[in-house]
């Protein structure tokens, strides 16, 4: 048991240095690396924060290579108008790439994404400034796809 734990800890430190190659490098440390790769392929993997700017074909390829089931996209929250524009832009991006992406409105969408070999996108903000001074804006933001607001950089 101690050997496996140490191997796992070594592999974690390798992940910090070589995040894209961690699973390929683990066979040096763990004789059960193939089992780990299979587990990763079957698991629901969600990246908790992606800043979704400047997406192109390479971005989609990197996302596909990552094996992520979904991610939380942190959109621009400068004000209500900018936030709504960001939400509309990402809703359109998801529609235009429906062969790769689905809009995540709840946990079931991550399971659907996994089954359909797509990536679920959970839209949200790292700030609440886009609410401005009207809690009514929360309803509009929710209807447009907002599913999380993180109270981090409030001003």
Language-model segment annotations:
Residues 2-154:
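N-terminal hydrophobic targeting/anchoring segments and the immediately downstream early-domain regions
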């Amino acid at each position: 048991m101690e050997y496996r734990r140490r191997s796992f800890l070594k592999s974690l430190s390798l992940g910090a240095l070589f995040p894209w190659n961690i699973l390929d490098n683990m066979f040096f440390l763990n004789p059960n690396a193939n089992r780990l790769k299979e587990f990763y392929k079957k698991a629901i993997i969600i990246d908790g924060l992606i800043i979704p700017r400047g997406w192109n074909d390479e971005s989609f390829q990197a996302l596909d290579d990552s094996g992520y089931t979904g991610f939380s996209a942190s959109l621009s929250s400068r004000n209500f108008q900018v936030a709504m524009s960001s939400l509309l832009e990402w809703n359109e991006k998801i529609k235009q790439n429906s062969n790769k992406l689905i809009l995540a409105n709840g946990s079931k969408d991550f399971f659907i994404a996994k089954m359909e070999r797509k990536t679920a996108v959970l839209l949200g903000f790292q700030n609440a400034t886009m609410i401005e001074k009207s809690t009514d804006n929360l309803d509009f933001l929710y209807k447009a796809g907002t599913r999380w607001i993180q109270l981090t950089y409030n001003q």
